[in-house]
Amino acid sequence: MKILVDENMPYATELFSRLGNVQAVPGRPIPSDALADADALMVRSVTKVNEALLAGTRIGFVGTATAGTDHVDDVWLQQQGIGFSAAPGCNAIAVVEYVFSALMLLAERDGFQLRDKTVGIIGVGNVGSRLDARLKALGVRTLLCDPPRAERGDAGEFWPLEKLVAEADVLTFHTPLNKSGPYNSLHLVDAELLAALPDNRILINACRGAVVDNAALLQALEKGKKLSTVLDVWEPEPELSLPLLARVDIGTAHIAGYTLEGKARGTTQVFEAFSRHLGQPQQIELASLLPVPEFSQIQLNGPLDEGKLKRLMHLVYDVRRDDAPLRKVAGQPGEFDRLRKHYQERREWSSLRVQCDDSASAELLHKLGFLTA
């Protein structure tokens, strides 16, 4: 059995070779000659999986090592009897930590305490729910907007988007991209919403680029809208608006979910799903795959304040390390994808053990995801 894997899926060759012969290939584009005799295909979000790619092949299973699936025509796959699995939640922690890094950076620059802000979270799935829990652990007021969950009667208090626009200091978007239907999220942030948004707010998009109307956002910023903006995703990709990049406060190349842990979770989840599909179920212990981090232990003396917390967070990951490279190469052909393909190793807070002499600080750090003694 021949299994094609994206060359940028960590541990894919090591794991999938347990099930067949593995060939690592570029994700954009996938060589057609490699597909000709392949039985299974494992991709990331850069690969559009549809009839145009797979018609006439013998592919019997597709896995995407990503939480999102809008790059996969799963309806067509089902019609063809092709097995399919994604990796829901695999990079949720990474995205949450990206948002925190950005917020802590803006808090330092603009002289505010995150605890004093209200954060509106739009989309309360794997990412949004984890972000909500960690913000609440820090004492931050949150407002949640998730119409599908509200209509299902899920536990929790959900509000219409209009309330978040009016009351939240921060709007952070973590929705899927739905281009039709009752939960259409295409251009959820449009000219009308931007006009209604009070000045001196923060807008974060780390889900899908087209959730925010990039043209409308650029126009608002060009007209003097006072809005701190963090964009990890763009409309379209891999191209992006250079004038918009020049005006956002933080801009990165769709890497919010790119921790080593997140990528490894994606690979292992898809591997386990494929092994079940073959009737050969296997389970992988994530920790057995991961290397020792560059920084693994630190001593915190005294109580934790936001300044110390920012330094701890940024010791593991500082979003500025991804903002500067994009600005340097944006507009050059192929550079957006190159930044993603050759992404510098990034770890999650759970890779750092913090020794504390203050029990309340240790409890908070544990809730935020750090290891504590």
UniProtKB/Swiss-Prot annotation:
Cellular compartments annotated: Cytoplasm
Binding site for NAD(+): 146, 175, 232, 257
PROSITE patterns, per the entry: D_2_HYDROXYACID_DH_1, D_2_HYDROXYACID_DH_3
Record-level GO cellular component terms: cytosol
Active site residues per record: 208, 237, 254
Alphabetically ordered keywords of this record: Cytoplasm, NAD, Oxidoreductase, Pyridoxine biosynthesis
Annotated HAMAP family: PdxB
UniProt key word NAD: yes
Gene that produces this protein: pdxB
Pathway of action: Cofactor biosynthesis; pyridoxine 5'-phosphate biosynthesis; pyridoxine 5'-phosphate from D-erythrose 4-phosphate: step 2/5
Protein name per Swiss-Prot or TrEMBL: Erythronate-4-phosphate dehydrogenase
Any one GO molecular-function label of the UniProt entry: NAD binding
NCBIfam families on file: PRK00257.1
A Pfam family it matches: 2-Hacid_dh
Record GO biological process: 'de novo' pyridoxal 5'-phosphate biosynthetic process; pyridoxine biosynthetic process
Family: Belongs to the D-isomer specific 2-hydroxyacid dehydrogenase family. PdxB subfamily.
Residues involved in substrate binding: 45, 66, 258
Catalytic activity, EC: 1.1.1.290
Native species: Serratia proteamaculans (strain 568)
